[in-house]
């Protein structure tokens, strides 16, 4: 007996430029460059592979699969490629799992031969998906409250060189930096636990030093201690921090991964700890403007999961990026977004006191300003470098010229003599 089967046409079935996405669909924006196929077919292949598809034509399609097909509803030429917007039914996504979302929309699609380049530009989750994520435990307002800093950027620094310090040496530097006015002492991305500086010894010593400085200065000080490692080790390290009275942990979120970050968001909530998100390794896929994933998409995912602050760039300094891109990321992190609290953007990379007026003019006061070499390289030492940074920030907030402020701040005066004032031009790639 012959069974009649209807052949299911593929790829172009995923393209409907007259389609209007529903309120409960997740929208993803891509830039892509076709490789030997039409733009419509390339876009359809992206939608297919990231939703229900396979490389071959099928003879049967389950009813749920039909209802779960992604739809390309926008397709326009852009530079050497095209911009596509794709609507995804929520039946494709597991609730509360960034891992599963990224495996779909940023997974196998990047390996397709039909594409020369593919870049995930942004994604827009509907509330029905977003409601399964907690977002930051503290966010900008919560951090300002426990730090006691109401109307200026927070200051942070990393002891330089970033490796090689014994626990005692690190503690001595921490005392000088905190005493000079730094709010947040930060480990660097690769500084975790070593024979010359064990995490367990460092966590005990540094919080004793912090308590001493707080008593001497009357200011709240915190330590962004790097707990990154296998997730079971991260959990133990977070518990040590909480037991010592710490308020923060730092995680290298890209190398740790979304799964580890989501798990640690639950752990840190139980322990009452804020998460400082370092983005080490992000440039492996954010830097190429024609391929990879944007920093905006990473920052959005990190905010959904619940980091309290995250590095985004400076537009000035050695790690400078494009001003418009960084401003867009920062504006998103600070915006109202359903129940998800705002996140502190962190500016870092080649910053020094002379850049403070320009940096604050560009990005405002809701910012964590991290200066490493720009503080540690002060000719009179790290305490003087810390004071110079604080004085420069105070001047910028008060609208006072740095040269004028330097008349009453010998530390700032000497710093400006060493590194000068900002000469940065903004709005272009630096």
Curated annotation (Swiss-Prot):
One of its GO terms (biological process) is carbon fixation. CDD domains: RuBisCO_large_III. GO terms for molecular function: magnesium ion binding; oxidoreductase activity; ribulose-bisphosphate carboxylase activity. Mg(2+) binds at residues 186, 188-189. The keyword Iron does not apply. InterPro entries: RuBisCO (IPR033966), RuBisCO_III (IPR017712), RuBisCO_lsu_C (IPR000685), RuBisCO_lsu_C_sf (IPR036376), RuBisCO_lsu_fd_N (IPR017443), RuBisCO_lsu_N_sf (IPR036422). Substrate binds at residues 162, 279, 311, 348-350, 370-373. The modification N6-carboxylysine is found at residue 186. Its EC number is 4.1.1.39. The record marks 318 as: Transition state stabilizer. Keywords: Carbon dioxide fixation, Lyase, Magnesium, Metal-binding, Oxidoreductase. Binds 1 Mg(2+) ion per subunit. Because the Archaea possessing a type III RuBisCO are all anaerobic, it is most likely that only the carboxylase activity of RuBisCO, and not the competitive oxygenase activity (by which RuBP reacts with O(2) to form one molecule of 3-phosphoglycerate and one molecule of 2-phosphoglycolate), is biologically relevant in these strains. Catalyzes the addition of molecular CO(2) and H(2)O to ribulose 1,5-bisphosphate (RuBP), generating two molecules of 3-phosphoglycerate (3-PGA). Functions in an archaeal AMP degradation pathway, together with AMP phosphorylase and R15P isomerase. Belongs to the RuBisCO large chain family. Type III subfamily. Homodimer or homodecamer. In contrast to form I RuBisCO, the form III RuBisCO is composed solely of large subunits. This is Ribulose bisphosphate carboxylase.
